[in-house]
Curated annotation (Swiss-Prot):
GO biological process terms, semicolon-separated: anaerobic cobalamin biosynthetic process; methylation
S-S pairs: none
GO molecular function: cobalt-precorrin-5B C1-methyltransferase activity
EC code(s) of this entry: 2.1.1.195
UniProt catalytic activity: Co-precorrin-5B + S-adenosyl-L-methionine = Co-precorrin-6A + S-adenosyl-L-homocysteine
Sorted UniProt keywords: Cobalamin biosynthesis, Methyltransferase, S-adenosyl-L-methionine, Transferase
Superkingdom assignment: Bacteria
Protein name in the entry: Cobalt-precorrin-5B C(1)-methyltransferase
Organism encoding this protein: Trichormus variabilis (strain ATCC 29413 / PCC 7937)
Length: 370
């Protein structure tokens, strides 16, 4: 299967082409981008370049994530570059139309650290010391595409994020992607007895912010099952699962590959634990038919607020304990020894990146992870 590039790479290539027009008044056919992560160069086709004024140019690229299930495939990325006034930052990066806003960070543009590094590194080297530019990234289809994502669950509204830690976009079903994650796990398992599994970038980011040692973080994407089995085989003593509740709760239903194209089960997990906890039939039905896990959580919060109950804590504590036990069972069933020595705990957070619950085991593990 064919890999491609992540959105920040196309944004960067467009910015390089727009800057080239400002300097040379010529259109580039290909933007050459240093990916940084990994250490290799990428040749990105440039669709169009136009001068908007003497001091401003626009270049357009088109997203190609490879053979990946990605709604950004073929979406256009615009990069507008204009000369700055000098002084301050050499490269100022802004988010235009279609770039999401972080509601929990003063509506700052959702252009995250890798994209920032990529743009800064590739553009600064093309500038003289006294020169400065302002780069505005625009996703014309970003606002409409964002409706089909879970971005709002992570506090990003009105558009898409320039997210990621690498320039390469591997197909979700690609063995190469799993091999890369396993390789990182093998390296970190040789250094630490306790590790933290994060499905995606939001988990990695929040884990760092609450004080977890970044060196102990391992990205799993949706491959939680194989990664748990690998960790157990490598002799990892403790694993903390740290993730968005709408993803991580799938493990409570025995779903160990969490991509939505393969399985869901969230409403079944939520409704089951509500029923086991004694929630009324009417409220269970509301939870079961909620359009998202976030909407179901909101209903439980409303119940707690109006009645003084403790349904959020009760239901989610039960889900977290089920996640822990299902993970133990999964590792044991796949262990060559017939038993699993690895201990699992779980922490679930909501759309506002606020922690909903920590399992009992997770509370015990935290001291070894910070």
């Amino acid at each position: 299967m064919r890999s491609g590039y992540t959105l920040p790479v196309f944004a960067c290539a467009g910015a390089i082409a727009a800057l080239h027009w400002l300097r040379q008044r010529q259109s580039l056919q290909v933007g050459l981008v240093d990916l940084i992560e990994p250490a290799q160069m990428a040749e990105v086709p440039i669709e169009q370049v136009a001068g908007l004024s003497e001091n401003m140019a626009l270049a357009i690229t088109r997203s190609d994530p490879g053979d990946n299930i990605d709604l950004t495939k073929n979406t256009p990325i615009w990069a507008v570059v204009e000369w700055g006034q000098g002084g301050g930052e050499q490269v100022t990066i802004k988010g235009g139309e279609g770039i999401g806003k972080q509601v929990n960070a003063d509506n700052r543009a959702a252009i995250y650290s890798y994209a920032q590094r990529l743009l800064q590194a590739n553009l600064t080297r093309l500038l003289a010391p006294e020169e400065s530019i302002i780069v505005t990234i625009i996703l014309p289809e970003g606002r409409s595409l964002a409706v089909r994502t879970s971005n709002s669950a992570f506090g990003v509204v009105e558009g898409l994020s320039l997210l990621g830690t690498t320039g390469i976009s591997q197909p979700l079903s690609s063995p190469d992607q799993l091999d890369a994650f396993r390789s990182e796990l093998q390296h970190k398992a040789s250094l630490y007895a306790s590790l933290v599994f994060c499905i995606g970038e939001n988990g990695l980011d929040l884990a760092r912010k609450i004080g977890i040692n970044a060196e102990k973080l391992v990205k799993t994407a949706n491959w939680l099952g194989p990664m748990l089995v690998e960790a157990e085989a490598l002799g990892v003593k403790e694993i903390l699962l740290f993730g968005y509740h709408g993803k991580l709760m799938k493990l409570a239903g025995g779903i160990f590959h969490t991509h939505h194209h393969l399985a869901d089960g969230r409403r079944e997990v939520l409704a089951t634990h509500c029923a086991l906890g004694g929630l009324s039939k009417q409220d269970i039905e509301i939870v079961f038919h909620a359009p998202t896990a976030e909407a179901a959580l909101k209903h439980l919060k409303a119940l707690d607020s109006s009645t003084g109950s403790d349904w959020v804590n009760q239901v989610y504590s039960a889900i977290a304990e089920t996640i822990d036990s299902r993970c133990q069972e999964y590792m044991q069933s796949h262990s060559s020894r017939g038993t699993a020595a690895t201990i699992c705990g779980s922490i679930l957070f909501d759309r506002d990146r606020k922690i909903i619950v920590k399992s009992k085991t997770a509370c015990n593990l935290m001291g070894n992870l910070c």
